Amino acid sequence: MADKITDEYAVGIDPEIYANNPAYSSLFNPYIHKQTIIADHVSVQCHIDLNGIDAVGSKFGNLNAHAGNFTSLCAPNCLPERFALVAYTVEYAFLHDDETDNAADQEALLLENKMLHQALNQSGMTSVSTRVSDKAQRKSEVQAKIAAEYLRLDPVFGEWFLNKWQTFTACVKDVRSLEFPSLDDYLEFRIVDAAADWTLYNFRWGSGITLTPEEEKLADPMSYVAYAELCLVNDLFSWDKEYASHIKSNGDVPLVNAVHIVAVTQGLTHCAAKAVVQAEVRAHEERFCQLKEQYEATDKPSHEVLRWLRLLEHSMAGNWVWSLCVPRYCKVDRNPYKDHLEKYGSDAVRVLTPLDRLCWSKQEIKEMKRNQLKEPSSSTYKTHFSPLEPNPGPEQTRLTISQTQQQRPVLNPYTYINSLPSKNVRQTLIAALNSWYKVPVKSLLIIEGAVNFLHNSSLLLDDIQDGSVLRRGRPVAHQIFGVGQTINTATYLMNEALYLIQMLSPSAVSAYTDEMRNLQLGQGRDLYWSYHTHVPTPAQYISMVDGKTGGLFRLISRLMRSEATKNSDLDISQFATLLGRHFQIRDDYQNLQSEDVTNPHIVSLYAPRANMLLQYTKNKGFCDDLDEGKVSFPVILSMQSPGFSNTALSSVFKGSRKGETLSLEMKQYMLEEITARGAFSETKAVLRKLHTELLSLLMETEKKAGGVENWALRLLIMKLDIVEEKKVAPPKSDSHWGVNQRRAWKGGQKNGRPIDKACFLRAMEEALQK
């Protein structure tokens, strides 16, 4: 079986690079990717994207002129279509690691990782104004680029991978306070701290290897041994640099390295400890080979597991040969980054870019066109745009509402709803558009504040008008503060928003009145349809959405444009309108879907009543749009399906206006009807079409903006996408490495150390004699 594992893209590297080097004693032969130039290109591109062309080579990551690119060596069978993204991500991880290593204290470290979380997840963001510096803007764009591309190539793995990245950085500890009684304790920590599993999972996905949970469990002991070996080799070669940094800082930079741990726990000199670590590396490689041989001898070993083990061998050998002479650890005669840029130029290295390819296939486009609805053109729903005339606003700004004694009662509902968790879509949009418009900080704060007031005002009124019970899993504001007080707060917030917008250019006020008019007209039509149980056509519904939901998105774009210092002629109103459509229809779709209600497997609808009750009380409530009698997009499509009678559905909707919550059985019946009529499938087809149009329009807009790629907007679109296929996501690799450590050495250890390795014993004797 092992002989059938082929190296499709990997080629052996010249033995002269490592064979005669006494520092290389790995049991495995190193390979490199045939298209390693791609990894080199994107490594330089990452530097340009992050810090500009003048800063290329100021720090070191993947590139190694002696042996080759780190990603090319460790993942030499990476699929070509994933290779650039994997290498770019690894390069960024190297640079981010340098940033966190250089953080002045734990607070600075947490701040650095918090910014990464916000960019990847586009939630929990701090004020947009904190991200207007060129450095912060560049970093945010790079992080968004990485996230958007993973979600584009593989939404299921992308979501898992980004969540794993956030979890890892959120758990980073201040190592100054950590103590390790033994090397085993250290390795259990180090595998997580060095993100070994995260990095290798990235390589695994890049290589097209997929393990089932059962296969993952079988491979875990071998994976642990390989991860530990990678960490030990890293510590061995980085020791001199880390020790010098520790001495130079008078001990402020901690020594978190296997060499130091061995020296302290075993009472050895650093020189002797290095010999012990070298022996540990060999012991781990030998143990890996033993475990692999045992697995290969089992009945029907998995082909995918064997591919994974082959990748681990490549990574161990690649990491070792890369470490022999790399700028991250030792001085080199020439800077490989500057040399590469000088040789190929800045245009050639721009491999990871959306402008040279579409993000969907021709077959996908055909499917979407076949299923698409006849939607109104952008001119069907007229908005009232006025000429944009940027003028400086007044000096005084009221960016937040100061809570005086007189204002506090009015602000209580606002304070409450503003404290609830949010998806931050509008704040994300503001930050993304600023990549193009470069709005001054003061104007940016005004826009952010006004949009926050308007959004919360809309939520307060929506909950009253819809008869909602929950908002983001919490009681709605009017149940706490009363309907009258909540309405008063909502109208007060509209006035406060106008007060702020008047500080901007005159065209900003026109944009406010235009879009607030559109928003109220759209909301009015929605309320009318729900109250009278009138079923509009899909085109009428989309026209309503263009006002109700698209209005605030267009207002953001128009306010940003009115204050722009760059690209002031860039009109993205059409994009904002399409974004509003996608956002609302997706919200309609998801409201009628849940973990227990997925299509086409309607059987999951009939879960035990206890499970349904649990789902019912979760978040906003199970299918609460049905309770509110809302004629949402899937409902409209279902009631326009030929060959079906709408009498029963219409009767249920009329009954729901009495203010009574529908029973679970009634909701099950309605969902079954909507599903049987193909409305959910048709809604997904419309969402895919909108997704396609948004990406296409984004690329057109990027060209109009001088080729400035907007990865934050692209990530926002990707996160709004509906994943159609249920793939097997890789298991969450938050397993206890201590358990895998014991499984890996079972039957061959004493006090945690191998006892059947002569090389280990010899090294110990030599170390103790020095």
Swiss-Prot record:
Species for this entry: Penicillium chrysogenum (Penicillium notatum)
SUPFAM superfamilies in the cross-refs: Terpenoid synthases (SSF48576)
Span of the annotated motif NSE/DTE: 234-242
Terpene cyclase: annotated span: 5-335
Reported function: Bifunctional terpene synthase converts dimethylallyl diphosphate (DMAPP) and isopentenyl diphosphate (IPP) into a cyclopiane-type diterpene. The C-terminal prenyltransferase (PT) domain of PcCS catalyzes formation of geranylgeranyl pyrophosphate (GGPP), whereas the N-terminal terpene cyclase (TC) domain catalyzes the cyclization of GGPP to the cyclopiane-type diterpene penichrysol.
UniProt-listed InterPro entries: Isoprenoid_synthase_dom_sf (IPR008949), Polyprenyl_synt (IPR000092), Polyprenyl_synt_CS (IPR033749)
Name the UniProt record assigns to this protein: Cyclopiane-type diterpene synthase
Region annotation Prenyltransferase: where it falls in the sequence: 336-720
